[in-house]
Every structure is written in C-alpha cells, then in structure tokens.
C-alpha cells in the first residue's frame, strides 16, 4: 500500500525478536523501528512529535495502560485532530482491560483440542486482518470529510468469528466438514496423507468415476488411497482437475528454498530446548 510505517518498540526491543528472529524480520521488513520508553517524558515527547504528522496510530495495549501514558483516544483526538486510531484489544467492552493472548481467546470458543497447542494463531492473525480493514475504513471516512475516528478490534471477537463453522456444526465431529462426508477429509496413503476436498457435486462424481468407487464410498476410498504415495495422488488429481493435496510439514531447507510445498517427514520432532547435551 506504499504506507510509511514506524514501529515503536520498548527500550528492550520486541520479545518476538528473541523468540523467533526470522519471523520478526519478516513481519517488520520495510518498517522503521524506533525504541522509546514511553514512561520517560522525553521519549513521550518524541512520540508526540511523530504523531503530529501521522495519519493513523495502531496500538496493541490495554486501554488502561494507554490512559496512564496520556494516549487515550479523547486525549489523542484533542491533541492530534487528524489522527485516526485503531486499538487492538483482547476483549470488547466492558472487558477490554482483561489480560489474554491467542491461546486464551481460542480456549473460550472451542477451537482447541487439548493437549495439543494450536498450529495457527487464529485470533492474532484474524485480528490483524480486521485491524487493516478498520484502518482503511477510518482513513477513507476522514478523507470523505467525516473527521478522524477511533475503532477497537477485539482479538477474542476474531476468535469467536472464526469458530462459527464449528459452533454451527459444520466443522464439528460428524459434520459435513468434520468427517461426516467422505469427500472432505484426510486419508492415509502408502506414504503420508492426502487432503481431499471434493465438496461440489461435479468434483465428487468425477472422483468416484475415476476411481471406480461404487459401494461403501469411505471404505473404498481408504483402501484405494493406500495404493499410492501422497505425492503420486497429488499428481494424479492435478491431471484430472480434482481438489486433492498432499499433507505437508512446515520445515524448510536449502533444497526446498523457494518451494514452500516441499515434502517432508510427518514424524514429530522432539524439542531439545533446555536439554543437557554435555
């Protein structure tokens, strides 16, 4: 979007840079990173100087914390009347100051399967997309003469929204997208698994015809998929315009660089963090 973005970090930096430097670098590519201690009056004055020429402020702090720093929306709007503000919070009012993270938001809406941790940070990523929409909406409204505005984006609400197919039964166990329909599911192959998504009738009928399935559809598919590897089935499906993909891992290596669909082992790796190797 060709926006000029300045990211304000605390003096110690963003913890993500320590946890996962590669991900941090990818997320912040093209941004100017400035470290400020906003409890320090001089650093706070530096922020105010930047806000004089800023179109949009995006925050991810609890409103009470922003208020203590003099960054509540009423204070900001009075001082910087052209500034729009998108505030990412954990929960909608009246609980916007309650603590939480992606894991606790997902826990509230049924998308966790203990003891496994979620592989996708649904609330964080969906919340980020909502924040972009909110930012564009506020800026467009300002350009149309409606003045600068403020909008909260609650991550828990993003988690709730993404859990709706589960809550409505569509993706629940036994639902059409939860194992109830044999044309939509995961199948074991001679090596690895495939994901089949033949939801539309023409895909489903073509699949059955190509494979010669006429009896117990699920049982026949389970038997047939065992005859080839996942990679072979994917190639077979591509030739027939069928929605089927091999299940992949997420590991990357030099050979796979540039090919995010590289086939990798599905075996779980045991974490060695904190392991004594002496």
List the model feature ranges, each with a label.
Residues 2, 30-31, 54, 101, ...:
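Short, well-ordered alpha-helix to beta-strand connector turns
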Residues 12-13, 24, 94-240, 244-248, ...:
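Acidic, glycine-rich segments within the central catalytic cores of soluble metabolic enzymes
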Residues 24-78:
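A structured beta-alpha segment of the ubiquitous adenosine-cofactor-binding alpha/beta core
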Residues 257-278:
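Flexible, small-/acidic-enriched active-site or ligand-binding loops
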